[in-house]
Amino acid sequence: MSLSIPDAFSFFKLSCGSWVSQRSSHHLLHRRAEPGASLIVVKELSATDDRLLSVAKLHQKNPNMLVGGCWVRWSGSMAWDQEGESHEGESIFGLIPTDENGREGLLLRDRGYAETAPVAGKFQMDEHDALLLSTSYDTMISNERFWFTGPDIRLRTSVVEGLSNTASFCIETRREYKAILNDNLNTNNDLMHSKFGW
């Protein structure tokens, strides 16, 4: 089962909310899998939001081409983390379609995931209404596929090639907004001590 989603911005709007993501990352060099988990918060931004306008300016793109975007914050951990190692951050995403249907185009970010420098990637919706993201960094290339099996379950696969060669699979489950207090990321003790590394 999958959802019918007309365009990429609709996909991002459907992704708004808070999510618990359970991940298995396969390190191809070591031939080992590493479990992990994260809490992700996504909020929609209008095309006129000052933060989106700043991202467009950062990438030297016409802000009038923006259809909207989102603010994303994440906090997580992986099983092999060293003491003091952190997987926390936030980013602004801006969408600029390059076709009249809004199903492909540019995804502007004020910071990346694999590398923290500002980055512009490409998005595309496939024939199954899944969202494909391709991002080229200085030292690696990331390809991701996101799709919904229902309004509250999102799946993700990702492959990173370069200095770090990994393949990952994530199951992301929606949580209610009331689980997020004062827009800060809070986790309960059960989640923090789960086998996924919290």
UniProtKB/Swiss-Prot annotation:
Pfam families found in the cross-reference section: CpeS
Compartments (UniProt record): Plastid, Organellar chromatophore
Keywords tagged on the record: Lyase, Organellar chromatophore, Plastid
Coiled-coil residue windows: none
Principal subcellular localisation of the protein: plastid
GO molecular function: lyase activity
Cellular component terms per the entry's GO annotation: organellar chromatophore; plastid
EC nos: 4.-.-.-
Cited HAMAP family: Chrphore_lyase_CpxS
Annotated function: Covalently attaches a chromophore to Cys residue(s) of phycobiliproteins.
Family indicated by similarity: Belongs to the CpcS/CpeS biliprotein lyase family.
Name of the featured protein: Chromophore lyase CpcS/CpeS 2
Organism of this sequence: Paulinella chromatophora
Upper lineage: Eukaryota, Sar, Rhizaria, Cercozoa, Imbricatea
